[in-house]
């Protein structure tokens, strides 16, 4: 039976000769980065761009892994994975180019972390500051159970060393692409998640990407309004037990 998804897809199509036309208001362009100014900052180790196993081998190995050991993630490896997801790789004019593509280089996706076991970091909720390659400590404490509940009670998120929580700041893309921006936002999240899956695999960690969430439970956990910014995607990361592998 047709529903709102079918309606959205149909109404957001581009058709020849009927493209939406609007003048971009540069004075109202949303900020590219979200900032937490009055929180503790944790500078991350400089990521490496040399060495590592080959891309083709990483692609061959990649699986969704749901069974994890109790081993902690190292801060160095977390830094490497964060940079791989959407770290800055170059500067052209006013644009910071990143490891993942984004429609119009507008980068609507923000990265939050639920840290359960990372050496040198206290457990808590963090935000990844991309331009500074550092972490913003939002709240200290154990939040694995709450994240698990927000992920439809999938326990692998509670057992993971880290859970990546991606949100979308929709207006960053809507400013240019109007309603079609919602297509691009989710594509952007997919690019980022695949970068994470490959980087983690290259470092010997397992990941599982999760789209089944109670949106507003996770929004409340991160103090997001669910309108201007909302959680859209998760990924667990941990050292895997080599079993229960699926696509």
Question: What is each model feature region?
Answer:
Residues 1-166, 170-171, 189, 203, ...:
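N-terminal accessory segments that position/regulate proteins before the catalytic core
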Residues 172-176:
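Short acidic/His/Gly/Ser-rich catalytic and metal-binding motifs that mark active-site loops
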Residues 180-188:
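Short pre-catalytic strand/loop immediately N-terminal to key active-site residues, enriched for Gly-Thr
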Residues 192-197, 202-206:
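C-terminal folded domains that constitute the principal catalytic or ligand-binding module
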């Amino acid at each position: 039976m047709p529903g709102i998804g079918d309606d959205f897809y149909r109404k957001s199509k581009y058709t020849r000769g009927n493209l939406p036309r609007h003048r971009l208001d540069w004075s109202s362009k949303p900020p590219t980065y979200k900032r937490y100014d009055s929180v503790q900052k944790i500078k991350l180790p400089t990521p490496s761009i040399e060495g590592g196993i080959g891309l083709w081998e990483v692609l061959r190995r990649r699986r969704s892994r749901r069974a994890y050991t109790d081993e902690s993630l190292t801060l160095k490896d977390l830094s490497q994975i964060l940079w791989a997801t959407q770290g800055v790789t170059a500067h052209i004019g006013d644009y910071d180019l990143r490891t993942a593509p984004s429609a119009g280089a507008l980068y609507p996706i923000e990265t939050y972390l639920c840290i359960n076991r990372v050496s040198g970091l206290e457990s808590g909720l963090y935000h990844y500051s991309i331009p500074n390659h550092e972490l913003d400590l939002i709240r200290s404490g154990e939040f694995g159970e709450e994240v698990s509940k927000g992920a439809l009670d999938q326990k692998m998120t509670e057992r993971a060393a880290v859970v990546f929580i991606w949100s979308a700041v929709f207006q960053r893309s809507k400013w240019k692409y109007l309603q079609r921006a919602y297509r691009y936002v989710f594509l952007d999240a997919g690019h980022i998640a695949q970068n994470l899956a490959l980087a983690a695999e290259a470092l010997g960690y397992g990941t599982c990407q999760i789209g089944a969430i109670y949106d507003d439970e996770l929004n409340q956990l991160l103090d997001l309004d669910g309108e201007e910014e909302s959680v859209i995607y998760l990924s667990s990361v941990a050292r895997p037990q080599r079993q229960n592998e699926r696509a």
